[in-house]
Amino acid sequence: MAAGKSGGSAGALFLKALDRSESKRDGGFKNNWSFDHEEESEGDADKDGANLLSVEDEDSEISKGKKLNRRSEIVATSSGDFILKTYVRRSKTDGFKTLKGNPIGLNMLSNNKKLSESTAGTALCSGTVVHGRRFHHAHSQTPGIRTAAQRKEYPPYVHKAENSPVMLSHGQGGDHIMKKTEESESYVESEIKRKVQQKRHCSTYQLSPLSPASKKCLTHLEVSEQREYCPKCGKEKENQTKCQSCGIVFHNDLQRNCRQAVTLNEPTGPLLRTSIHQNSGGQKSQNTGLTAKKFYGNSVDKIPIDILVTCDDSRHNYIQTNGKVILPGGKIPKLTNPKERKISVSDLNDPIILSSDDDDDDDDRTKRRESTSPKPADSACSSPVPSTGKVEAALNADACRAEQEPRSSPAEPELNTIVIPRKARMKDQLGNSISTPLKRRKVNSHAAFIHPMSLSCQNFESVILNCRSIRVGTLFRLLVEPVIFSLESITIHLDGPESDPVDIILNTSDLTKCEWCNVRKLPVVFLQAIPAVYQKLSMQLQMSKEDKVWNDCKGINRITSLEEQYIILIFQTGLDHQAEVVFESIITDIGIRNNVPNFFAKILFDEANSRLVACTRSYEESIKGNCAQKENKVKTVSFESKIQLRSKQELQFFDDDEEAGESHTIFIGPVEKLIVYPPPPAKGGISVTNEDLHCLSEGEFLNDVIIDFYLKYLVLEKLKKEDADRIHIFSSFFYKRLNQRERRNPETTNLSIQQKRHGRVKTWTRHVDIFEKDFIFVPLNEAAHWFLAVVCFPGLEKPKYEPNPHYHENAVMQKTPSAEDSCVSSASEMGACSQNSAAKPVIKKMLNRKHCLAVTDSSAAQEESEPCYRRNAYSVKCSMKKKNHAINENEEPSNGESTCQDICDRTQSENGLRDECFSSVHHPDALSKIRLNYGDQSADGGKLLEDELIDFSEDQDDPDDSSDDGLLADENYSSEIGQWHLKPTVCKQPCILLMDSLRGPSRSNVVKILREYLEVEWEVKKGSKRSFSKDVMKGSNPKVPQQNNFSDCGVYVLQYVESFFENPVLNFELPMNLMNWFPPPRMKTKREEIRNIILKLQESQSKDKKLLKDSLAETSLGDGAEQYASASGGSE
């Protein structure tokens, strides 16, 4: 009866607890069961899942040989008012059961439970049905498998501290849960302790009846423990398997639960992972002598890989293996056989420490990360699972995919493996990877193009190539349009200067020979044809013996002269490979069609050059035979004779001077440094190489290195100290950097364009104040053309007049008695009638000269209607000159010219300028056309951009004056320059002079940018604002000596700077004319002069280096001798 009553009261209490669990949000289906007071919070109940029962308790009960045959166990208290009844599910099989819910995917077991231990003898129930409901722990029926983390195999020196499970009881006074703490077990004396919080493993082991210690705790409601003693020494047991004092082994405990007692002290018998297959049903392990092979059965030999752990859908995090991140569904590296791998005690990983205490959450996470981080090992893959064995888990993030894919076996091809090449795994003696040099496949450009082109060249029946000239016998013509080569004909278009355009069509069937030279510096083709072709060309091109264009003294049918047997086509540039293949294919097909053997042939450069030289020599001899030719033909003869002479000297063929100037050669060879100027230890040295020296060859453009070098050489070598202190020369890169566009920068978004420009070059003047200088030289390069900008007197705010040191009062009184008064008079005091009356004789004199441009009365009227802001001194000088002409109107023109020439001669030594008023400078027609076109563009631009134009005078804006033939402006300027010595004062005003050797349109934008730079620089240096507008800082484009080719612009820039100090400008009133600043013949030797300077510096610097080396060698020898002498003396 008492048992029935107690059973009924226990059932009632259980139903009440069941009702409470159903009222919770999890519905009572969680795998943590706790029975507590009704006022307990849900959070506390959730934490009790790990504190309900301990597997250690059931171990103690199983060790006594008790077996559970009931589906439930009733634990009664001494008071009889509470009975704890625990329901567990039993599995139909003897395998293990996987525990879920662990956040790191590990199955935690109790202490001292090896994976090799079995649970034979415990039959798990399938569940318990109460009131129509089945109670279980929300786990599947699959057999449980304990992972390596559940083994809890600690090294001997590690203490293990366990938290005993919490025993629950129901007291009348509402007693709370009390914990029982077992004393920590230790293998060796060590300070390392591990705290393991146990969880319930009801699905893995059958819950046994409570141990006597547990019953005692529940009965007396106190924390106590039943102590056991060693049967041999009588001391208290601290370990259930071995006595710590005498070392005796407890055999009864070793055989409990039919587990094999495998200790870590045994070096043999490696700890193996569990198989992924469950043991055969009904097979049970023996109590003693259980080996790994018997425990796993044949599955160990068949399955060499670990289990594929399927992750929950909610845990699609990246899985780390061997320190690398593998995406979900990714392939896992190949796993090796665990039987072949052994591990020592020192290689064991630390187990994970779990605790339900909230205060230790952070520490647990840190330790968990440390324990899961793989150690460097020579295994193919390191698993994130901490274990003591050879852990090689093949992880797959996709659960569905893992279930569908069959498990791999050694017999199956390993498709999910990543194999590293053997060469990549090779290591040297030190264990480092062997880095083999990257071998690049050598690509033969010739072979790469020949194959595809040779297959498709039959599809090309014609090719258009650019040719620069043609020679037919002794006839030479330049070609403007390209030549068309086809299988049927060769079409050449000639545009004669005096005749109508002619189209020459050579039928390929009439050709007898084609010789081809495809050298980069001389690509040329020599064609030979039947005599009828020469006769046709002679008529078509109007060749005659009188003109000596084609001399066939021996008859057309008996052509023996070398120069008359070829039709020569000289190409613009060397053909690329594709064009060459097509061209040669067409010529080869022509020879096949004409059935001519050896029709196409390639010749060397020397042979091609000798043929061209022979053609030119023959032409010169034919010209010498006819001395009674017309004047224009004589010019042509002399023109061609120059070519012949150059060909003799250089053994190189050029068509004419223009072509020779345009033919640029490319520097080939190793680059070697010649000099550093100034040499060390001076700062700012410029290195000049042999490649830079190549730029000084005729026809080559000067580069920035030569420009910067020579400008620095002028300042340091040729200028006086006081002159060098008055100037500042910017680098040739200054303006480019000033005007360079940059990417958007958040720091400069609020700055203006002027400030952004200045910010790029603000450090260029950190050591100099440019406003204290008189002249600032800025070399500029735009569109591959060099020109010079000179900022004059940037520190002045207005024009400044100073006494003229070269003023001659006697000369002024003799020529113009009123000149002194007119120099100080204003524009309103000038007589307009005298200017009008003097203008006509001047124009008449200019019209009488055949080399001057026609000047109409409208131009004179334009001069008279100039704005009032024109400089007074210039107007006074013009009026003085015109008055002088009016006085001498009745005299002969020669007298007036001689008088002007005398004045110019007298002022030559004083001003450093020689002005020949009526000399004309001839330039090539092409340059004249370009300048005229630029002049027209500048005139149009002046109308459109009146506000942007710098303050250029009428001579720059007038198209006629922009050309070199505008001598009216030259004459006016010459009188101004020639009469500098007649003025008592000279003007110094802030201005920007642009000196261009190839005058074109006004470069107003350059002056504008320089003005804006000066404004910001003034604000930065002086701390105040100042305007550098066109009213304050005027811009002018003075007339300077002009180049007669297209490559000497840089040489002229250097000469402008040099002449600025050799023949200084005294008066800076605008406009100014410097056309005769230096003699033109000097420019022909300027390149050679700079070259010689560099070579001399190289020689001197090489000598200095040699002397320095010799001195160092002598010093080292002397030191060595002294050391030797001292050493020998000490030994004696």
UniProtKB/Swiss-Prot annotation:
Protein's pathway: Protein modification; protein sumoylation
Modified residues (Phosphoserine): S41, S355, S356, S371, S373, S938, S1131
One Pfam family cited in the UniProt record for this chain: Peptidase_C48
Region entry Protease, spans: 686-1132
Coiled coil: none
Keyword vocabulary terms for this entry: Hydrolase, Isopeptide bond, Nucleus, Phosphoprotein, Protease, Thiol protease, Ubl conjugation, Ubl conjugation pathway
One Gene Ontology term, aspect cellular component: presynaptic cytosol
Major localisation: nucleus
Location(s) in or outside the cell: Nucleus
Linked residues for Glycyl lysine isopeptide (Lys-Gly) (interchain with G-Cter in SUMO2): K648
InterPro entries: Papain-like_cys_pep_sf (IPR038765), Peptidase_C48_C (IPR003653), Sentrin-specific_protease (IPR051947)
GO biological processes: protein desumoylation; protein modification by small protein removal; protein sumoylation; proteolysis; regulation of kinetochore assembly; regulation of spindle assembly
Function of the molecule: Protease that deconjugates SUMO1, SUMO2 and SUMO3 from targeted proteins. Processes preferentially poly-SUMO2 and poly-SUMO3 chains, but does not efficiently process SUMO1, SUMO2 and SUMO3 precursors. Deconjugates SUMO1 from RXRA, leading to transcriptional activation. Involved in chromosome alignment and spindle assembly, by regulating the kinetochore CENPH-CENPI-CENPK complex. Desumoylates PML and CENPI, protecting them from degradation by the ubiquitin ligase RNF4, which targets polysumoylated proteins for proteasomal degradation.
UniProt-recorded name of the protein: Sentrin-specific protease 6
Protein species of origin: Mus musculus
